[in-house]
Amino acid sequence: GIEFVTGTEIANGKNNQNPAVAKGDEMAAYLMDAKVKNVKAEKLLEEYDAVVLACGASNPRDIKVTGRDAKGIYFAVDFLKTTTRSLLNSKFADGKYVSAKGKKVLVIGGGDTGNDCVGTSIRQGAVAVTQLEMMPKLPETRAANNPWPEWPRVLKTDYGQQEAIAKFGHDPRIYETTVKEIVKNKDGQVCAAKCVKLAWEKDPETGRMNMKEIPDSEYTIECDLILIAAGFLGTQKYVADAFGVKLNARTNVETAPGAHKTNVDKVYTCGDMHRGQSLVVWAIREGRDAAKEVDTFLNGYSND
């Protein structure tokens, strides 16, 4: 049969109450905030004929600026995860989530995760939402160097931005901008972010685009909640270490091209942990492909 172990984290002992920051080779299984059991990775390999690691790629990229230690700064994944968990567990009655109600929110990052932060902040009751994007604003229609059937590099206004436009009357995104410093009040709480405009220039030798700060373009954005959605750096390393699986240069679990088997016998991987942060449709595809590979490993063939 197949057994799904959800919410799995690495813990360093039975009494560990915060497995998300622990290290070691003990596995702690959690379901809806309830501790189920502790078991070593080696024990799982002894008990099961195959183990599929599908732990995501949630290691967030941080920002290295003065004032980063201020209160009121969260990674996007923590903000979104606590919101969803509190909603499902208690419809927010437990209060175990980061709330944007009444806050001026600054979202750092213009991708899908940043969009989710914008939409969630608005639904929680934020009084202002600003989203920073380092890249230039894309055109609304295809450029001459982006013909069909290439993927259209055009401006996309997702649900979060659409809700912001409907509520505040303007697009929350500010392009070609980054944070230089975070300002704290006397209590150590974030109260503003000092930003600077960016310019992108093409290197004549390499052809690569490089960004540089525009002199005298600094300005300040008032905010009391900052959500960092600056991308992800691959999977959490402690899971891979527990099973002894190798990571590639992108810190995703390494496999042969088009395969899901790791360097460890009986251990497979799929989803974001395998290919890096992506959309749920890819996670579904990866899960199906990994299941077929495991089926073939166990039975010698697969019926799809």
Task: Please describe what each predicted stretch is.
Residues 115-117, 273-298:
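A conserved FAD-binding loop/helix module that cradles the flavin
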Residues 1-65, 180-194, 199-202, 225, ...:
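Feature captures the FAD/FMN-dependent oxidoreductase FAD-binding
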Residues 89-126:
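Rossmann-like NAD(P)H-binding beta-loop-alpha module
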Residues 1, 118-181, 301-304:
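Rossmann-like dinucleotide-binding cores of NAD(P)H-dependent redox enzymes
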Residues 110, 133-137, 184, 272:
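Cofactor-binding loop segments of dinucleotide-utilizing enzymes, especially the Rossmann-like FAD-
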Residues 71-102, 201-277:
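FAD-site-proximal beta/loop scaffold in flavoenzymes
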